């Protein structure tokens, strides 16, 4: 009997200690200080990493108020968290707890074998939520990041507060012939240890900023170099995974209680304007939650980071946009 009591007592001590440890970790997270802005020169060094249950180590940047509402900024194809670096400080200074992950195969995250579909990315993202202790968040995605956010919203609706789709289209694989053409012309011919040419990278990241942006040249040079050094395996897995991605069967299961904002540039030649009406129908988006920026291309958050962030913040706060005509102020 005494032995049983002793065992029970030890068990209770372990449970209590475990609970105290978790509470301590939460308190430490809430008390830590995070940057409100990060320079382009310091961006890469500001990355942390976490091991995920999906088997990869994911790199990420963390900013803002640790006690604030969690907001995830997700980058596009062959990019990394730097993609949102020009806009991230607006969200951090507005009081959000901002996370900017590097998707698998990109940035400083692992690049395992196998094609990376949007389901793969969404599953990684859920594992990131679990690893970081995030229950629910606002998700903002650009291009491939928006495809990931769409997929995540349809697979894990209980973890989505609101979502923002920037430069997006319905995810139906070969629908985007631009990707298939670029892969055939520039990625497939590469040697196993080769990298895309400077000319291709210049075209891939062709951007005409519409705002005065500090250190934009440094930003763009880093974006190009960080994508160009990716292995052929990574480029192949990213491209072919995207071309193979098709979530058409998931769209009927969209949870209508999750508000969706759609932002698009009128000059976007990658995620074409002809698909915007259909995208809005799939996610029940009305005129108060859609804006097309006149004269802006695919990389909205590169070209007009302040306007992009300001419009997203206004929508998050009020459920509507300050203007919907797309005219740049």
Task: Please describe what each predicted stretch is.
Residues 53, 100-140, 144:
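Active-site loop/oxyanion-hole signature of alpha/beta-hydrolase fold enzymes
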Residues 56-108:
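Conserved HGGG/HGGXW glycine-rich cap/lid loop of the alpha/beta-hydrolase fold
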Residues 146-157, 163:
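Short glycine-enriched nucleophile-adjacent loop
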Residues 154, 163-193:
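Flexible "cap/lid" loop of the alpha/beta hydrolase fold
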Residues 254, 260-296:
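Conserved loop-alpha-helix segment in the C-terminal half of the alpha/beta-hydrolase fold
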Residues 296-305, 309:
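Catalytic histidine-centered segment of alpha/beta-hydrolase-like enzymes
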């Amino acid at each position: 009997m005494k032995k049983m009591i002793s065992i029970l007592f030890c068990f209770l001590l372990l449970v209590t200690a475990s609970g105290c440890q978790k509470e301590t970790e939460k308190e430490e997270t809430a008390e830590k200080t995070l940057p409100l802005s990060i320079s382009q020169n310091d961006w890469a060094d500001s990355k942390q990493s976490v091991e995920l249950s999906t088997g990869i180590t994911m790199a990420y940047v963390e900013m803002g108020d640790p006690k604030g509402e969690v907001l995830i900024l997700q980058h596009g194809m062959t990019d990394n968290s730097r993609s949102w670096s020009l806009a991230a400080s607006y969200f951090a200074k507005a009081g959000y707890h901002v996370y900017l992950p590097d998707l698998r195969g990109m940035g400083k995250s692992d690049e395992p074998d196998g094609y990376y579909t949007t389901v793969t990315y969404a599953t990684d993202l859920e594992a990131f939520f679990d690893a970081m202790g995030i229950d629910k968040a606002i998700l903002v995605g650009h291009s491939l990041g928006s495809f990931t956010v769409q997929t995540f919203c349809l697979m894990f609706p209980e973890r989505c507060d609101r979502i923002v789709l920037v430069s997006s289209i319905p995810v139906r694989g070969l629908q985007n012939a631009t990707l298939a053409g670029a892969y055939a012309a520039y990625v497939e011919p590469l040697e196993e240890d080769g990298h895309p040419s400077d000319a291709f990278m210049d075209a891939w990241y062709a951007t005409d900023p519409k705002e005065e942006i500090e250190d934009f040249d440094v930003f763009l040079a880093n974006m190009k170099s960080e994508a160009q050094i990716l292995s052929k395996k990574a480029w192949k897995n990213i491209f072919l995974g995207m071309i193979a991605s098709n979530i058409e069967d998931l769209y009927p299961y969209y949870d209508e209680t999750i508000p969706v904002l759609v932002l698009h540039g009128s000059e976007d030649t990658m995620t074409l304007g002809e698909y915007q009406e259909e995208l809005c129908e799939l996610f029940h988006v009305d005129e108060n939650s859609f804006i097309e920026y006149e004269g802006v291309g695919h990389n909205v958050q590169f070209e007009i980071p302040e306007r992009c962030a300001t419009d997203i913040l206004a929508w998050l706060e009020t459920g509507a946009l300050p203007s919907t005509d797309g005219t740049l102020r």
